[in-house]
Amino acid sequence: MESIKVCMNALCGAASTSGEWKKGWPMRSGDLASLCDKCGCAYEQSIFCEVFHAKESGWRECNSCDKRLHCGCIASRFMMELLENGGVTCISCAKKSGLISMNVSHESNGKDFPSFASAEHVGSVLERTNLKHLLHFQRIDPTHSSLQMKQEESLLPSSLDALRHKTERKELSAQPNLSISLGPTLMTSPFHDAAVDDRSKTNSIFQLAPRSRQLLPKPANSAPIAAGMEPSGSLVSQIHVARPPPEGRGKTQLLPRYWPRITDQELLQLSGQYPHLSNSKIIPLFEKVLSASDAGRIGRLVLPKACAEAYFPPISLPEGLPLKIQDIKGKEWVFQFRFWPNNNSRMYVLEGVTPCIQSMQLQAGDTVTFSRTEPEGKLVMGYRKATNSTATQMFKGSSEPNLNMFSNSLNPGCGDINWSKLEKSEDMAKDNLFLQSSLTSARKRVRNIGTKSKRLLIDSVDVLELKITWEEAQELLRPPQSTKPSIFTLENQDFEEYDEPPVFGKRTLFVSRQTGEQEQWVQCDACGKWRQLPVDILLPPKWSCSDNLLDPGRSSCSAPDELSPREQDTLVRQSKEFKRRRLASSNEKLNQSQDASALNSLGNAGITTTGEQGEITVAATTKHPRHRAGCSCIVCSQPPSGKGKHKPSCTCTVCEAVKRRFRTLMLRKRNKGEAGQASQQAQSQSECRDETEVESIPAVELAAGENIDLNSDPGASRVSMMRLLQAAAFPLEAYLKQKAISNTAGEQQSSDMVSTEHGSSSAAQETEKDTTNGAHDPVN
């Protein structure tokens, strides 16, 4: 059975067993007050007293900005600072004026401890501890080092209190810790009375980050070590260190790569440079490195899912809603905040960001930061350019005064401790190792995002310069001059074989004149003058004018140059033109060979061939395993080099299939053309014959007194080409049917005629018989 929770706000008193409960101010028991969603949101936005305690007493105004502050209320105890001369000031004004003092800090055990008012107390506390172990722990464990400083004055009160909560530390200790501590734990008895206020811990270089999610066992709970030692101009204020952002909506924990890396100097610069942000508290939320698609013209910025759900308004429809975001100059932009369903999840984007990114002059690799101003609650969009020089300037070593972490920043006021004696060579080596690792990570963050390298195709245009480099390298190779080659003949071709490898020669320029004569020009290594040599001369890597034995007049560097500066430029240009023409001719030959083999490319990729004796020969292809001989898949059909290995006269199965298909296509094309030509010729001939027949019909002259026979058809016995074509186009079944009907009618007509003739003949015989009988009958 679930227990009923009651809101700790006396004016609310909402009770429920379910729902989202938020954490409020710390109590003496060590727990945090449980607030309902409404009260918790007001507490997180620092307007709790303005909403619920507006009519109560205890309200005072800030001496600097006249902001109303509720004194004596536990919900506003971290929102104000007491002045020594009387009065109160808000935490923002106190931070700007540098009047943040070391007040009483509320520990989780509910006890109040006195604060330290000077650096001498800090020095005395540090004297009672093992400083060697302290430095050892801080330098080896970068996760809990000074670089993990939190800017707690810019965080929400609920998150400030949550950092000190006992149950929160238990939850964090139960989770794995990514950091490995090689030093002892820091929870020693002298530190119990060294507790300081949360706000003064902001610039402490030993500030830990207990809210960071870890992956390995976490050491024992550690309290703040020292306070009041603000490293002005030190390494801590210059390095962009990832800091855990404030708690967002729900319990979503952001990955460390999205943590804001804004520094104290940048916050102060923003407050002083832009007046519209001077009266507001800037809370860094998260940041994102722009990808190529984010900085492109698509106008869409992909947001981390956890960040969008934690700090942006909740949306339930994919269309989203318009979101107003200000840039650091105060200009307001309206973006469409929406999401896309993606594998039972969501991908949140901001659409319409191209004008804003272009106004900031951002590109791929730059970082976009998102912050919130309090108490207005407006979203602010900033940026940080990615420059390689920034990361290098961060880590110049500890020789510079402003980067010496352990010489200026940690020197106590009493001067009893000599920090230089405590740092030995091994500690300095560890410091250098840590700085190198930080430099490497910073370089990884600021690297420019570009297109990934692709595999170069050897016959494509992408490697044109590479191929030229190969040809030039071939020109530099010379046969060794100390040995003589042995010549052997292979297939009517003479080859020179050397026992020693080739050597590199000097690069020369070859020029072809208009007459067809080729010249070789070489530059002296001593004087830089150009000398002309025969084409067949091979030069060593080092050559000077004194080596020019073929031309005694040019065998000295004091001899005048054979080419003027203008002629030298012409020579270089002609040499490049000569190489370009040679490369173009080789490419033309390659294209011609590819066109010639395009028809048989598939046949050349045949897998198997069957010989006359039935033996199977497998061609050299990129056939993958477990495919039997004769497989015709796309992988097995492709030869290793992408070109065919079969001859045009090959009779393998694939080659024959390709040739047969080609012959079939050509035959169909030829038959189609012949049929079209025949039909055109027949049509033209029929038209000509019809005209001739019409013109050649004889005129029938009727004699006087003769009548016209209307049943006669003068053209019935004449046969024309049109009637033949119509008869040929007449369907066969209809023709046979009509022929059968006509035959049947003719047979019936002939049978009727025979029966009629038979009847008439029998009647005539009977009449003749009667007549005969009557003639022979005697008269009675």
Swiss-Prot record:
**Keywords carried by this UniProt record:** DNA-binding, Metal-binding, Nucleus, Repressor, Transcription, Transcription regulation, Zinc, Zinc-finger
Q: Record's superkingdom?
A: Eukaryota
Q: Name one GO biological process term.
A: regulation of DNA-templated transcription
Q: Which parts of the chain are coiled coil?
A: none
Mark the CW-type zinc finger spans by residue number.
515-565
The UniProt function text for this chain reads: Transcriptional repressor of gene expression involved in embryonic pathways, such as LEC1, ABI3, and FUS3. Repressor of the sugar-inducible genes involved in the seed maturation program in seedlings. Plays an essential role in regulating the transition from seed maturation to seedling growth. Functionally redundant with VAL1/HSI2.
User: What name appears for this protein in its UniProt entry?
Assistant: B3 domain-containing transcription repressor VAL2
